[in-house]
């Protein structure tokens, strides 16, 4: 009897199990498929992220054989196209110097002109490997935008430019632009800085912004803008190149209204590429510390100590960085030292290096490269 009872109980339980399983299959078949699909999507996203994390940008550039570098299209002295459509300027030559360090050839590069609105997306999407595009290093750009910044190549500051005939002088200040139509680039720290400065001073301005500083400048020339504002170096370039013969433009205030540390910008978490970019800048500054430039660098090959290491001699560190031992010798030989670039592109605009914040620390400036060892 006991055995018969247990067999009946087992049969009942088995029946319940089959019914429950059947009902469960009816209710959850679509959910199960959705779960599988979601899991597959998650796996795909994980795969993309893993692939991106595993892709070493320095290796990719060396395999590709060229560097993609973004610059401004309208920054006089820093990046403008010549009559042959080739970008020339301080920033453009820093792009070339980086190409030399990584690939050994200043011509192994595609220099791409970008607007202020395009520049960060171009890095994030991989259109460019690097920006040398008068881009200010800020907290939000370093964190929220997801960029990494290299050493400052130009310490700048925002200033304003207006016409003397409108009552402005070099001693004018921001308070003197009350009621003025002020024009600048859209989507820049410049736009934010001038709006904030006006608010803090309790003055009223009409702020008009444009995508391209060529348009800003043209509006100023035509009288549609009373004042224009951007980095001081940019205003110096515009004044030198575009001031009409019948007008006198003046830049003010003497003390810039902001800090604008400009330098190379690249995507996050690419430390080997970042090292190559950063040490290209440092090498060009260290060369100046020793009085080495494009014209005389051959005289210093085989030097002892830090300079010898920098130029590829005994104890060099470039090989460990994934670069050629003489990478920085080639940078100086093919492109130049920091002061070579300044003399070539910025001095003709009236920008003075000696004694400025952009001079070496030994001359009272802020340029202080770490030691090459």
Per-segment meaning from a language model:
Residues 51-131, 360, 364:
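Extracytoplasmic small-molecule ligand-binding "clamshell" domains
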Residues 1-20:
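Sec-dependent bacterial lipoprotein signal peptides
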């Amino acid at each position: 009897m006991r055995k018969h009872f247990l067999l009946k109980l087992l049969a009942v339980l088995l029946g319940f199990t089959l019914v429950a399983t059947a009902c469960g299959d009816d209710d959850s078949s679509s959910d199960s498929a959705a779960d599988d699909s979601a899991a597959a999507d998650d796996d795909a996203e994980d795969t993309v992220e893993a692939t991106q994390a595993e892709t070493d940008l320095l290796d990719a550039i060396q395999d590709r054989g060229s560097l993609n570098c973004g610059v401004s299209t309208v920054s006089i002295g820093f990046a403008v196209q010549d009559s042959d459509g080739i970008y020339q300027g301080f920033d453009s030559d820093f792009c070339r110097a980086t190409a030399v360090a990584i690939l050994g050839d200043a011509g192994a590069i595609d220099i791409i002109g970008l607007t202020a609105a395009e520049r960060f997306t171009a890095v994030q999407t991989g259109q460019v490997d690097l920006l040398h595009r008068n881009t200010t290093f800020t907290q939000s750009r370093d964190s929220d935008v997801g960029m990494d910044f290299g050493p400052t190549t130009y310490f700048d500051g925002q200033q304003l430019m207006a016409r003397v005939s409108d009552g402005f002088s070099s001693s004018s200040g921001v308070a003197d632009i009350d009621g003025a139509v002020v024009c600048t680039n859209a989507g820049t720290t410049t736009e934010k800085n001038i709006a904030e400065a006006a608010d803090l001073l309790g003055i009223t301005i009409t702020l008009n912004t444009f995508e391209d500083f060529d348009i800003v400048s043209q509006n100023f020339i035509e009288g549609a803008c009373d004042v224009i504002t951007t980095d001081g170096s940019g205003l110096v370039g515009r004044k030198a190149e575009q001031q009409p013969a019948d007008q006198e433009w003046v830049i003010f205030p003497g003390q810039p209204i902001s800090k604008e540390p400009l330098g190379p910008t690249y995507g996050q978490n690419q430390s080997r590429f970042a090292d190559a970019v950063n040490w290209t800048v440092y090498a060009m500054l260290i060369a100046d510390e020793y009085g080495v430039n494009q014209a005389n660098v051959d005289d210093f090959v085989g030097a002892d100590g830090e300079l010898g290491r920098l130029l590829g001699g005994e104890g060099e560190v470039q090989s460990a960085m994934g670069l050629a031992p003489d990478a920085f010798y080639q940078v100086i030989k093919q492109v130049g030292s920091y002061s070579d670039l300044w003399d070539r592109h910025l001095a003709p605009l009236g920008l003075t290096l000696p004694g400025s914040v952009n001079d070496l620390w030994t001359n009272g400036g802020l340029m202080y490269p770490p030691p090459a060892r």
